[in-house]
Design a protein with these regions (language model features):
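Non-catalytic accessory segments of hydrolases
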Residues: 33-199, 316, 372, 469-489, ...
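Extracellular structured ligand-interaction cores
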Residues: 59, 123-127, 143, 171, ...
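Short, solvent-exposed turn/loop segments enriched in Gly/Ser/Thr/Pro and often Arg
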Residues: 180-182, 229-233, 435-442, 508-514
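Substrate-gating cap/lid region and adjacent catalytic-acid/histidine neighborhood
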Residues: 261-262, 298-481, 492
Length: 562
């Protein structure tokens, strides 16, 4: 499902949604990803030593599995099913149940626009998974990490990742909620004013964090030591939550991997979002109904999911992003952060050195990036006037248009916007910035003839962080150097989650971000990155950001795959 592979980049219009969908289909075909649900941790659930474990939540008891590898509780409801009269409403409390609820199987993924024949998807999807270390509850509660998956706000689920090793090795509780996708998570219409209009998905994430606050102590976690972390669309989501008043106090730290919400395209003004909603309601046959909201809520879920968005979003035209100017995001995130109206918590933030190569590689399966016509056509989909960009990257394009395209996505969509976000945050709270770099990063897609080297592509750090299969990768086969690096990377993340500082004995010092250069994280080297801004041409992209009119650009994003 490629959920975490295609993320959004806020600073640049990369792919129109029809092309984005084709890329996801290609990726899914190459990975056979539809049936894979690594987060169900079958090796743990079906282990010979697995025993039932019952935990009491505020809605009822749940029965998970405990064994030598860890403890897991899957498919736990954190909100009522958002169906029927609850569609396009803020999440409501999960109904209580009697007896003990089975929690050994994950719930379905939230209904995406592109389903590729997937069977385990549903509009009724607001469940979460809890991964805990083995053994009894500790004397002191454990730090909690809440994972927000990627997928361009259109795809993905909490079972795309096996988070059990992270929980066990770092001695933390990891919680992975689902959240509504696409139209169900971001639809806006004048008939739906209030109740989370245009940002239901962000309220789902907040509801999961409130569930953590109420219930995580029963699983051995510390409700007041919570770190949200996510990649691609997950990082965008966390960036939104930094600017969302309703999320205040729900987390104490944040980790953003390959996602920055500073560009104007990261959210859509209410007027524009509602215009798109009116057009979509017309297409669905509801605009002339006496009760537009009731009509929209009565439609079959598949019909709603399949309808063309009729608006702009993170991936360009006919895509989705949260609405600003409403209850959830009163201000665009960039303005909220500039005005210091954001959560001032410690942040760990970064990107991968070759983010754009994954997108260029996927486009190579359906297009001809090395032809001038194909290259220029793609750039015109990314930017209303690409002439300055083509001129700035003419030296790279003269050698390889494929490389130029990949660099444009990396630099303008990820590296430089993320650096700007770090600059905006670091004067008020600790910021630790990184650039992940690994020329031999494990790769889960089928290698076709004439494949280009992918290097540290988008989402390639995840196999090191989780050290378990995820939707784009099987069981990692690390070299000794890669295994040592994976342990160090995970130790940085775990220490930050526990204390707000990634540093500790036995690993290189990670200085606070000074507004300029991040720390290089690589199996071969952990150290300063003095040439980051120059290599990614950030002077150019920072100037473009100040010149770009609102909502004139967008890009691919996120996925987890997340």
């Amino acid at each position: 499902m490629m959920a975490d592979v295609l993320t959004h980049t806020a600073d640049l219009r990369m792919l129109q949604l029809k092309h984005f969908g084709i890329l996801l289909l290609v990726a899914c075909t190459l990975t056979a990803c539809a049936p894979r649900r690594p987060g169900e941790v079958p090796a743990l659930v079906h282990a010979a030593d697995a025993q039932a474990e019952v935990v009491q939540t505020d809605a009822g008891a749940v029965r998970g599995v405990a064994g030598a590898q860890g403890r897991v509780f899957l498919g736990v409801p954190f909100a009522a099913p958002p169906v029927g009269a609850l569609r396009f409403r803020a999440p409501q409390a999960a109904p209580a149940w009697k007896g003990v609820r089975d929690a050994t199987q994950a719930g379905p993924a939230c209904l995406p626009r592109y389903r590729f024949g997937q069977k385990q998807v549903s509009e009724d999807c607001l469940t979460l998974n809890v991964y805990a270390p083995p053994g009894p509850a500790p004397a002191h509660p454990r730090a909690v990490m809440v994972w927000i998956y990627g997928g361009a706000l259109e795809l993905g689920s909490n079972v795309d990742y096996d988070l059990s090793a992270l929980a066990a090795r770092q001695n933390v509780i990891v919680v992975a909620p689902n959240y509504r996708l696409g139209v169900f998570g971001f639809f806006a219409h004048p008939a739906l004013r209030g109740e989370g209009e245009g940002a239901y998905a962000l309220l789902d994430q907040q509801a999961a964090l409130r569930w953590v606050r109420r219930n995580i102590a029963a699983f051995g976690g510390d409700a007041h030591n919570v770190t949200v972390f996510g990649e691609s669309a997950g990082a965008w989501s966390i960036c939104y939550q930094l600017a969302a008043p309703g999320a205040a106090g729900l987390f104490q730290r944040a980790i953003l991997q390959s996602g920055s919400c500073l560009a104007s395209d990261s959210s859509l003004p209410r007027a524009e979002a509602e215009r798109g909603g009116v057009r979509m309601a017309q297409t669905l046959g509801c605009e002339r109904s006496g009760d537009v909201a009731a009509c929209l809520r009565a439609l079959p879920a598949d019909s709603v999911a399949d309808a063309k968005p009729q608006r702009r979003g993170l991936t360009g035209s006919d895509a989705w992003a949260p609405m600003s100017g409403g209850e959830v995001l009163p201000l665009p995130p960039a303005k909220a952060i500039a005005n210091l109206q954001h959560a001032q918590v410690p942040v760990l933030i970064g990107t991968n050195r070759n983010e754009g190569r994954l997108f260029a590689q996927l486009l190579s399966y359906i297009g001809k990036l090395n032809l001038r016509s194909g290259y220029e056509a793609r750039l015109k989909r990314m930017h209303a006037d690409p002439s300055a960009i083509m001129a700035r990257y003419a030296d790279v394009a003269a050698q390889s248009r494929w490389d130029a395209f990949a660099d444009i996505v990396t630099d303008g969509g990820f590296a430089c916007p993320t650096r700007r976000l770090g600059q905006a945050l670091h004067t008020r709270a600790p910021v630790y910035a990184y650039e992940f770099d690994n020329p031999q990063a494990p790769y889960g897609l089928l290698r076709l003839p004439f494949s280009h080297p992918l290097g540290a592509y988008h989402a390639s750090e995840l196999v090191y962080l989780f050290q378990r299969p995820w939707v784009l990768s099987g069981e990692p086969a690390f070299t000794p150097a890669q295994q040592a690096f994976a342990n160090t990377l995970q130790d940085y993340w775990g220490a930050f989650a526990r204390t707000g500082d990634p540093n500790g004995a036995g690993r290189p010092q990670w200085p606070r971000f000074d507004g300029d250069a991040p720390l290089t994280l690589s199996p071969g080297r952990i150290g300063a990155t003095p040439d980051f801004a120059q290599r990614h041409r950030c002077t150019f992209w920072d100037a473009q950001a100040t010149l770009t009119p609102p909502h004139a650009t967008a890009t691919p994003a996120q996925s987890h795959s997340h």
